[in-house]
Design a protein with these regions (language model features):
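Structural motif
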Residues: 75-97, 206-220
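Hinge/cleft segment of the Venus flytrap/periplasmic-binding protein
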Residues: 286-333
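Hydrophobic alpha-helical segments within soluble ligand-binding/sensing domains
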Residues: 131-170, 271-291
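Extracytoplasmic "Venus flytrap"
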Residues: 40-60, 66, 77-86, 180, ...
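Flexible loop/hinge segments that line or gate small-molecule binding clefts
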Residues: 113, 119-156, 253-267
Length: 333
């Protein structure tokens, strides 16, 4: 009888252990499943060039800071329209249809394409100069819809001051930009006001596509003492052409982003495109965590730093003063 009782106790104990083991195994499987479950987001980049590429790098870093990592819990559905507006529309629709939980548009045309494709999915703007003017939000502090993000606003008054410091004898500034980019038109209008207030004559040179850049720069560099280009995707994508043509007349080019100074511009009051991307990624993470785009204020990036290219200055016969060098956050030799 005692043996039977011991046998029964053993069987019960073993049964409990088996059930417990099965429970723990199931729990571990559930935890493992939860840890590998990925959030899927769509990213649309307007065109390939260094500035927008840096923004995309920053976006991934910002998402990582916010807890969303591509090797763990994040899947990015990335598309690049390569400057083709028809592709912007096609890709925007694809990103909406692909089951993404959130969308990010890098540059104004990309953000506008996504906005036209959905009013339901949250959209984060990356590098949109005038979100209100681009009809993406109704108010910067209270966007009011499914869109918020980060706005880059070139400090044009500082840019004019830098031109005066580096080329004090210049009287005429030629401004090169794309006629198809709303953000560029806004920057040009603001720059023109600041430059004219400082006593400069401003000549505008708008191009409809990168195919027109060489001929346009040839005319501009023959008539203007210096050239200026805002944050402009079309110009940036063909900046090597701008430099090669302007160098024929030794016309200095002032830009609005660092990589264009590295690519042959003389100087810039620049916004960090990478940092702008980081801010965009962190905001995307915030929305994924449950924040509402409608009441998430648009973040403004407008504090620039000076970057100069000493090598280009020497090639153009321009001496950069000690004051200019001392205020520069980066000097390219």
């Amino acid at each position: 009888m005692l043996k039977n009782k011991n046998l029964l106790a053993t069987i019960v104990a073993l049964t409990v252990m088996v059930i417990a083991a099965l429970f723990l195994t199931q729990k571990e499987q559930n935890n493992s499943s939860n840890s590998t479950e990925k959030v899927k987001i769509g990213v649309l980049q307007f065109v390939t060039h260094d500035s927008l590429d840096e923004i995309y790098k920053g976006i991934k870093a910002g998402l990582k800071e916010g807890g969303y990592i591509t090797t763990d819990n994040l899947e990015i559905d990335f598309m690049n329209a390569e400057g083709d507006q028809s592709q912007v529309q096609t890709m925007s629709k694809k990103l909406v249809d692909n089951g993404n939980e959130l969308l990010i548009g890098i540059a104004t045309p990309a953000a506008q394409g996504l906005a036209n494709a959905t009013t339901e999915l949250p959209i984060i703007m990356g590098a949109v100069t005038d979100p209100v003017g681009a009809n993406l939000v109704t108010d910067l502090k209270n966007p009011g819809g499914n869109i918020t993000g980060v706005s880059d606003q070139t400090p044009v008054a500082d840019a004019v001051s830098l031109i005066k410091e580096i080329t004090p004898d210049a009287k005429t500034i030629g401004v090169l930009y794309s006629s198809n980019e709303d953000n560029s038109k806004i920057q040009v209008a603001e720059f023109k006001t600041a430059a004219e207030e400082a006593g400069y004559a401003v000549l505008e040179y708008a191009v409809a596509s990168s195919n027109e850049i060489a001929a346009t720069v040839e005319v501009a560099s023959s008539k203007a003492d210096v050239l200026f280009t805002p944050v402009d995707n079309t110009v940036a994508s063909a900046f090597s052409t701008v430099v090669s043509v302007a160098n024929k007349t030794k016309t200095p080019i002032f830009t609005s982003v660092e990589d264009m100074v590295e690519g042959g511009g003389i100087a810039s009051v620049t916004l960090s495109q990478y940092d702008l991307g980081v801010a965009t990624g962190k905001m995307a993470a915030k929305i994924l965590d449950g924040a509402n785009p409608a009441d998430t204020p648009v973040q403004i990036f407008n504090e620039g730093t000076v970057v100069v290219n000493q090598k280009v200055a020497k090639e153009l016969g321009i001496t950069l003063s000690d004051d200019v060098i001392s205020k520069a956050s980066k000097v390219i030799e």
